[in-house]
């Protein structure tokens, strides 16, 4: 292992799943995707113990991992890919609670509390996940103290994310303000400078965006067209380029 990279060069490359076209890492110790999230930075002995209680699977996009209201069978670690958490009303209206990137954990709060899952978790891209049964995770966290810190950090991040969304949806005066807030957040999180502005990936449909900001798909389509016509941004198939950041900021009431 080199001091510079921290990468073990003896690690075998992941095998490729030809069905979904993504790589698979069966064991955490061999993982090439390690990030500073949850279990990724544990010592080798802890990772080995964790591997012994997990089940690795690969899922296509639009796979429901668990549904809102179900009893918590266990938690999922999103090794690669992406997922979304949605909540629904009795009338069938759906709101996207959060977009979950690779490296995060799904179902943690319900597994700890024993209460039903508070949202539906669904993959939005081909994804590798590790599943841990609830009773196995509870025992594992009791046996490995270092797990407790990461559990607390994950729960804090979830609370902050929920609070930010409530603020964006609950305090915004219009759909235009909510959309502007969302686009600026995406730009801040993953924007990269380009010749004409800040470019950031958008892997969501107008329907998905509408479910994130609590409005209709038609409203999202109309607002994005208005932003394009005013040359505030350019929309490509899987990305947007923000040209006039200040004009979006002006839509947000302090």
PLM region spans:
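Phosphate-/nucleic-acid-contacting segments
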Residues: 175, 186-254
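Glycine- and acidic-residue-biased ligand/ion/polar-headgroup-sensing regions
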Residues: 62, 73-86, 102-103
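Short phosphate-coordinating micro-motif centered on Lys-Gly-acidic
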Residues: 65-70
């Amino acid at each position: 292992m080199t001091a510079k990279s921290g990468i073990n060069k003896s690690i075998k490359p992941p095998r490729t799943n030809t069905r979904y076209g993504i790589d698979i890492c069966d064991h955490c110790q061999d993982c090439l995707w390690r990030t500073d999230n949850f279990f990724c930075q544990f010592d080798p002995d802890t990772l080995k113990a964790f591997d012994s209680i997990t089940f690795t699977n690969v899922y296509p996009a639009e796979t429901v991992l668990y549904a809102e209201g179900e009893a918590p069978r266990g938690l999922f670690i999103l090794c690669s890919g992406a997922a979304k958490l949605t909540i629904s009303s009795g009338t069938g209206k759906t709101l996207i609670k959060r977009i979950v990137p690779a490296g995060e954990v799904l179902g943690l709060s319900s597994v700890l509390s024993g209460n039903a899952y508070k949202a539906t978790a669904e993959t939005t891209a081909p994804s590798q996940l590790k599943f841990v049964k609830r009773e196995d995770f509870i025992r594992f966290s009791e046996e490995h103290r270092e797990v407790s810190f990461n559990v607390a950090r994950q729960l804090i991040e979830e609370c902050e994310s929920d609070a930010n969304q409530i603020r964006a949806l609950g305090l915004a005066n219009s759909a235009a303000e909510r959309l502007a807030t969302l686009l600026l957040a995406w730009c801040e999180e993953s924007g990269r400078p380009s010749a004409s502005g800040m470019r950031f990936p958008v892997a969501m449909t107008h329907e998905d965006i509408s479910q994130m900001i609590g409005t209709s798909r038609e409203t999202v389509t109309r607002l994005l067209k208005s932003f394009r016509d005013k040359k505030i941004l350019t929309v490509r198939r899987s990305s947007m380029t923000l040209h006039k950041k200040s004009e979006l900021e002006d839509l947000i009431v302090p």
